[in-house]
A protein has these predicted regions:
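Conserved AdoMet/S-adenosylmethionine-binding subsite of the radical SAM
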Residues: 91-244
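Short glycine-enriched, charge-decorated loop/helix-capping segments at active-site entrances
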Residues: 79, 172-178, 246-254
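Auxiliary Fe-S-binding modules of radical SAM enzymes
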Residues: 4-27, 204-281
Length: 281
């Protein structure tokens, strides 16, 4: 949730990371701002450090040199994940790469976690970017009240959102919440006219079924603002993060879908008459 700084004029938020030179979250060269806190509980999340809204301590054992200076770890083996930053602090970091954004038609993408959990902070940051000619996008699970998204729309060029499962009971089981709001918000977003991309993470044995992908693709076809439907292959790179946080990775050992299986699902989606892309999450 967004906070108010001591000056009462500069809102602050909890940020886990600011990743520069990202090429997968919108057009051109981008900087991705990762917000801390998510209202879903997907057990495959490859950014588990962004789920809790509060700062956390993490221990990366492979970086430990047993020097005894744990409070000021020189190797990054012990780190605090999540820093409180003001809009101005974050914007200064983003603005440093203005020339790259302009040359590549790039910009800034808000990700997470779930940026709409800190909607006021997100809005102010997007507004600041828009005022200075920086392209903007947001990645969201689209499951929070649409009013939070509405506040961001005047300052957004593009929205990326997930539809993980069309079966509501299964969606509740694996994310902790219903998909009803997601689907309703997707339709409301379509009426806004803002360009959108729908994504499905392909989790082996859960979301990667022909039935699920076909049903999502059929729904996507009803959304006139969607530029394309993206299938994101399973990403096992989050396993170390779970260990660092003292958490169990229930999907440890699972591997991404092979190219043939990925292509087969893409063909299923294409049968709905929509543009489909696929790749690594």
């Amino acid at each position: 949730f967004a906070h108010v700084a001591k000056e009462e004029t500069d809102m602050t938020g909890i940020i886990t990371d600011i990743q520069k030179f990202s090429l997968h979250d919108g057009k051109g060269i981008r900087t991705t701002v990762f917000f801390k806190g998510c209202n879903m509980r997907c057990d495959w999340c490859h950014n588990p450090e962004t789920i809790s809204p509060k700062p956390q301590r993490a221990f990366y054992e492979r970086k430990c040199i047993h020097c005894g200076h744990c409070d000021h770890c020189p190797t990054g083996g012990r780190v605090t994940i999540g820093q409180e930053k003001s809009v101005e602090e974050v914007y200064r970091e983003l603005a440093a790469d203005l020339p790259y954004y302009r040359e590549s038609d790039g910009g800034v993408t808000l990700s997470g976690g779930e940026p709409l959990m800190q909607a006021e902070f997100a809005r102010e940051l997007l507004k600041r970017c828009r005022e200075n000619g920086i392209g903007t996008a947001v990645e969201t699970n689209l499951s929070l009240p649409f009013e939070r998204m509405e506040g961001l729309l005047p300052y957004l060029d593009q929205v990326f959102f997930d539809i993980k499962l069309m079966d509501d009971a299964q969606h509740r089981q694996v994310t902790g919440i219903s998909n009803a709001t997601v689907l309703e918000n997707a339709q409301r977003l379509a009426h806004s006219g803002i360009p959108a991309v729908v994504r499905t993470p392909l989790i082996p044995g859960i979301t990667d079924t022909v039935e699920n992908i076909g049903a999502i693709a059929s729904f996507v076809r009803t959304l006139p603002n969607v530029r394309y439907y993206e299938l994101l292959n399973f990403n096992p790179l989050g396993e170390e993060k779970y260990r660092a946080l003292g958490l169990t990775c229930v999907h440890e050992g699972k591997r991404p879908l092979k190219k043939e299986a990925l292509l087969a699902l893409a063909q299923v989606a294409q049968e709905s008459g929509i543009r489909v892309v696929y790749g690594q999450e």
